[in-house]
Every structure is written in structure tokens, then in C-alpha cells.
A protein has these predicted regions:
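Hydrophobic beta-strand-centered segment that forms part of the acyl-chain substrate-binding groove
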Residues: 5, 71-107
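Short aromatic-glycine motifs in intrinsically disordered, low-complexity regions
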Residues: 9-19
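Catalytic strand-loop segment that frames the active site of acyl-thioester-processing enzymes
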Residues: 20-55
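Conserved positions in beta-strands of structured domains
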Residues: 26-29, 92, 97, 111-113, ...
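Short coil-to-beta-strand transition motifs
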Residues: 18-24, 102-106
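Active-site helix/loop of acyl-thioester processing domains in fatty-acid/polyketide metabolism
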Residues: 55-80
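HotDog/MaoC-like acyl-thioester-processing domains
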Residues: 2, 37, 69, 101-104, ...
Length: 146
């Protein structure tokens, strides 16, 4: 059984193709067949922070990287293979209600709607202090390893 504590102990960099300074997720906090969650502290040196606020493009990238963390976890711990590159194929019904400030902790939940032929369709929700900041439907295309 996968516990939150065991997930939090995973170095997120092991799951993502992105590297600093473009890592937009902090810790993996939940994983099951359909749902993946991450937790991220907004830091002042983040490239999407302007005037102390984490911008809307950063929220979208955070959702995409939560999807990437899910794919990375499956590849590393279940399928025992390497990290795959993924690309945002589509963003639909994006709604940004607010943006977090430096020091805030955001929680991102991605729920898989469909996962077939290297394409993942998911709903993403970003919250902070119990308030929803962003919601979207996202499609991620995964490049097969060569």
C-alpha cells in the first residue's frame, strides 16, 4: 500500500523530465489508479512569480507537471522504466479564480478521465487554503522511449 509518507519521501526530480529552474511541483502526496496529488510551496525565486504572485501560466504548468509526476511514478515504480517526455496536447475549460502568493502552499489534484495510446486526459484542480484557484481539463501526450 502506498502511503502519503512514502510518497513525500520521493525526490520529485526522479519523476519529472523537467529540471530546475522549471520544476513547478514540490512533493507527491497521493497516488492511485485515477488520482494524483502534489503539494508545492510557492517560492520567491520561481520563474513564474511576479511581484510576489505565482502567475496563471505557472498554475497551468503545475497541473501539467502533476500529470508528469503521475506518469513518472507509474514508469519508475510500477513499470520499472525511465522517464518519458510529455507534451501538453490541449487545455480546455481553463478557469483561473486566483493566484497564490509567495509562501503559500498549493495542492494540485489530477484525476484521470482516460489514458490510452500514450494520451492522458485529466481534470486538474489547484487549491490553496481550501479555496479553488484553478480548474482545467488537460490532455498530455507522452513520447514513447526510443
Amino acid at each position: 500500500m502506498v502511503t502519503e509518507e512514502s510518497l513525500r519521501n520521493i525526490d520529485i526530480h526522479e519523476l519529472l523530465p523537467q529540471q530546475e529552474p522549471f520544476v513547478m511541483v514540490g512533493k507527491l502526496t497521493a497516488f492511485d489508479e485515477k488520482r494524483t496529488m502534489t503539494e508545492t510551496v510557492i517560492k520567491e525565486d520561481n520563474i513564474f512569480v511576479f511581484d510576489g504572485v505565482f502567475s496563471a501560466p505557472g498554475l497551468v504548468e503545475n497541473i501539467a507537471q502533476t500529470c508528469a509526476a503521475r506518469i513518472g511514478y507509474v514508469n519508475k515504480y510500477i513499470l520499472k522504466k525511465g522517464i518519458q517526455l510529455g507534451f501538453i496536447g490541449a487545455i480546455r475549460n481553463l478557469e483561473i479564480v486566483g493566484c497564490p502568493k509567495v509562501g503559500d502552499v498549493i495542492t494540485t489534484c489530477v484525476t484521470v478521465i482516460d489514458d490510452v495510446l500514450g494520451m492522458t486526459l485529466a481534470n486538474g484542480v489547484v487549491t490553496c487554503n481550501g479555496e479553488t484557484l484553478a480548474t482545467t481539463e488537460i490532455k498530455i501526450a507522452v513520447k514513447e522511449a526510443e
